[in-house]
Amino acid sequence: MVIITTIVIVIMVATSAGKTRLKPHYGDGDDDRAYVPPDTGIDNDFLPDPKPLRIVTRNEWLASPPKEELTPLTLPVNKVIIAHTATEGCTTQSMCVFLTGHIQQFHMASDSKNFSDIAYNFLVGGEGNAYEGRGWESQGAHTKGFNRDSICIAFIGTFSSVEPSKAQLSAAQQLIALGVEENKLAKNYRLYGHRQLAPFESPGRALYKILQKWPHWANELSNNHWSDPEDQNSTRQ
């Protein structure tokens, strides 16, 4: 009888311990997701994909202030333009923060683009975060002739032959959905690849093919579009 009682007690203690054991909370202080080890790529995350959208604010990525007051947008806008930054990519928040700051410096430098601020409204990183550029309220400087009625989302990286990560694609889709929900984007907005409206390879051939399967895709070209020499199936105006 004593032996049986002892066994029952041991089983109860083990079961209770199993129920209360928690995974440790990891993080490097600038990422609010639980159980994400410092500086890991999104592919190694413990959370399911897609993860909830996180927008890293200008203050968080240490943005420089604009050189001058930015022109406000009239909301909701009717176009979403997807670009790529034509830089290296990033798979950790620390690297994405670094690249976002570097892109802003390049855009604002007097011996470079000499823009008032970073050109894009938002950027998305390979780790699945969105980064606030000019935001929802201000005109970008990304697509001449179309800045006043659009939001530009730039994928950090170069996607001529390599596709973005699932987390990066998800961040952009969630950001667009948020824009519609908050009346920043018209419910019947049109989605464009940067190359459709400007003579640039952006957003890269691989990403451009993916965009053509997204909702609200606009199968049209401006007079100043990019002509891809490798794409025999380009749409014609």
Enumerate the predicted regions with their spans.
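Basic/polar, cationic surfaces and motifs that engage anionic cell-wall
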Residues: M1-T87, G125-Q237
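A general structural signal for stabilizing positions within well-ordered secondary structure
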Residues: T71, K113-N114
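Active-site acidic/histidine clusters and adjacent loop/turn architecture
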Residues: T74-D111
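Alpha-helix termini
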Residues: S110-K113, E182-N183
